Amino acid sequence: EELTKTRKNFSIIGEEIGELKNSDKENYWIIDPIDGTTNFLHGIPHFAICIAQMSNKEIISGLIFDPIKDEMFFAEKEKGAFLNNQRLRVSNKGLLDECLFSSNREGVKFSNLNMRCSGCAALDLAYVASGRLDGFFHNRINLWDVAAGALMVIEAGGIVNNINKFSHNNINIKAS
C-alpha cells in the first residue's frame, strides 16, 4: 500500500497477489512480504521481507530485511550492495572444500559440497552477497524470492546466471 503511494502507476508482482498490472507496464514492484513463510509459521527465526524494483525488464534495486537480526540488505544497480550501510563483497575462497553453499538440492549433483537448505532464499542470496555463504543453487523458485538477492550478489561482485525475469516461477538460479 505504501509503495503504491509513491509510484501509484507501477505494476506489482508478488507472492500474495500474483501479477497486478497498472498503467505503467514497464515498471514493477516485486514483493514477497515474508520469504521463509514456513520458517516464520514454525517459529524458526530465519525469514525476510523482500522488495525489488524492475524497470524495462531489469532489476534496478532491491531490499531484503531480516527483522530478527535487524539487518537491512539493499542494492542499487551500478551503485553497490550494502548491509546497514556497510559495503558488501562476495567471498573469494579458492577451495571448494572450504566453501558453504545453499541449495534446495533438487537437481544438484555435487554431493561432495558443504550444503545447507535454510528455507529462505532471499536471505541466502543476501548471505552470498555478504560472503557468509559462497554460493546458491536453486531450481523451480519464484521471481519474488530471488529478484532482490540476485541484484545484491551482482552488485557485491558476484555472478548470477541469466535468470528469466519474464517468468514468475520455475526459475533455476545459480549465484556465487
Regions found by a protein language model. Name each.
Residues 15, 65, 139:
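Conserved residues at the C-terminal ends of beta-strands
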Residues 3, 12, 37, 66, ...:
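Residue-level signal for inorganic ion chemistry
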Residues 60, 87-90:
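Short, isolated positions in well-ordered beta-strands
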Residues 89-176:
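An extended, acidic
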Residues 23-82:
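DPxDG-like acidic metal-binding loop motif
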Residues 15-16, 32-35, 39, 124, ...:
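Acidic active-site catalytic centers that drive phospho-/nucleotidyl reactions
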Residues 1-34:
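N-terminal subdomain of lithium-sensitive/metallo-dependent phosphomonoesterases centered on the IMPase/IPPase/PAP
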